[in-house]
Amino acid sequence: MRPLTDTCPKPLLQVRGQPLMLWPMQALALEGFVSQLVNTAWLGEVIEDYFLSKTSHLPSQNKHSLLLNSEHVDIQFSHEGRDFGGALETAGGIIRALPQLDMAFWVVAGDVFMPNFEFSRAVFQKFVRSEALAHIWLVPNPPHNPRGDFGLSPSGQALNLFRDAGHTLYTFSTVALYKKALFAPPFCAVPAGNPQGIKFALAPLLRAAMDAGRVTAQLFEGEWTDVGTPERLALLNSAT
């Protein structure tokens, strides 16, 4: 995304009139998910300063309160870049933040645009009651990922399938529900809080949990964009 991200972290790039990361934060608030954590790496201090300028600080709780869609949202931060000099990859960052999270929680990447996605409270509660350790949303494959990532069974199980075996695969949207137990043995040996700053990719962990039958999924066919290039960003902002 350079040169755009030389001075502005990707989640703060403007998409249709507001920072990219505010779209999912507002959607979460609409469903009553008002305790949110922002995980930062590149230019993390710029992200925190942005929210500091718009929030009231709650020093006793190390939180900041922000008004989104008439809902007061409490925002916490987990700073990979400040603490370890760079990003810890997706799973490593989640594990770093685990002590600040509830037993089940939403995750969405800061560089995807899904303006019509509903962070459903009913789906969340169903997931909490289930045996699944993860529930992920898949999307039809975009041009930049034509082979897809994971399969989907008729019963809603996410499948760890080989891309070259003729299976129908879909792209992982990055939106997911997780339980803390996914980031613990036997699937993960990195301790909660990731005190050593170990880089840990999410896909191998998810694939292992899929093989154990512990990951469910569903297909999202609404608007979705991985805002990974200046051209994709420009295309989004040119849409009417």
Predicted regions and their residues:
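Conserved beta-strand segments of alpha/beta enzyme cores
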Residues: P11, D74-Q76, L133, Q157, ...
